[in-house]
Amino acid sequence: MINTAHLRKTLTLAMLISSPWSLAQAADYNALVSANATGANAYKTIAEAIASAPADSSPFVIYLKNGVYHERLVITRPNIHLHGESRDGTVITATTAAGMLKPDGSKWGTSGSYTVRINAPDFSARSLTIGNGFDFPANQAKDNDDPTKIKDTQAVALLVDDKGDRVWFHDVSLTGYQDTLYVKGGRSYFSKCRISGTVDFIFGNGTALFDNCDIVTRNRTDVKNQQMGYLTAPSTNIKQKYGLVIINSRVIKEKGVPAKSYGLGRPWHPTTTFDDGRYADPNAIGQTVFLNTSMDDHIYGWYKMSGKDKQGNTSWFHPQDSRFFEYKSSGKGAEKNAQRRQLSDAEAAEYTVNKVLAGWVPTAPKGK
């Protein structure tokens, strides 16, 4: 039970969503976060509000007033829900890159570079921005012999980790450059979201459904007349039916991004330790599927990705050996050719929201 000292407050949060579910027009909240927070259940940091949640799994709803919150958050309690005042006005940000050093001198690595890490089930967030503010363009502009230049530029904004399941994001913006969104856990649902980046900026082995979202490729000034990046890098296990599924969405670009400069995805086979050595996971037969999605002219199709074999040599993994498909793509970036395989109507019928999410129906939470 929640401590009776927690006041019940009610906010009217008008929400519009073009998904099979409608959100409640009002939601109770258990804590308020604001730079000017005063009084019971009001906090100046999101971390403090999360820490105030009781040690159970009851829904705990936190309302975030507009502002920029410079925090790195780890969610380990089930049923935490973050509701922002507005998507572009409520911003959670940090500036950690994989190649930066921890206090002990080791590197953060990709998994450690997150701004927000979800490692518990039944989390949701809506009407806010989660960003990794690592200045990728400024770093890339440095000379290669500059000792301050970071070599490992992966910078995750959101990590849905191993214990993350039934995770829902609505009207959320995820901003970064390389590796913006890492879906490592179970099932995630992104509705009416905006996700931006450059290289492999939606990646991982989890099941993630993107419904009516904007996938935004960013401009780069450090590369000319060559591939700028890739939207996805799935590492879905072959035994897992669904990976990264994008439906009824838009693949768009920032100003200055040239035609045919971005790939829809490439197959990531993570280097993994096995009984007979450490090498690229042969069972990571990644899946990315685009259905009923419009694509601007910067899209050229799929691309290959390298890994290490048992002897430590470079080996290449190709789109045709992965589960990469499209269905009814439209726009200047849409093409039908041997490299861009298409689903039949019958095959596309297997990619309903209910089937991809394995029966989980996202519902709006209420606090107590």
Question: Can you describe what each PLM-predicted range is?
Answer:
Residues 21-26:
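Sec/Tat signal peptide C-region and signal peptidase I cleavage site
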Residues 2-11:
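Bacterial N-terminal signal peptides that target proteins for export
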Residues 27-368:
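Sequence-level preference for short, compositionally simple segments enriched
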Residues 10-20:
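Bacterial N-terminal signal peptides
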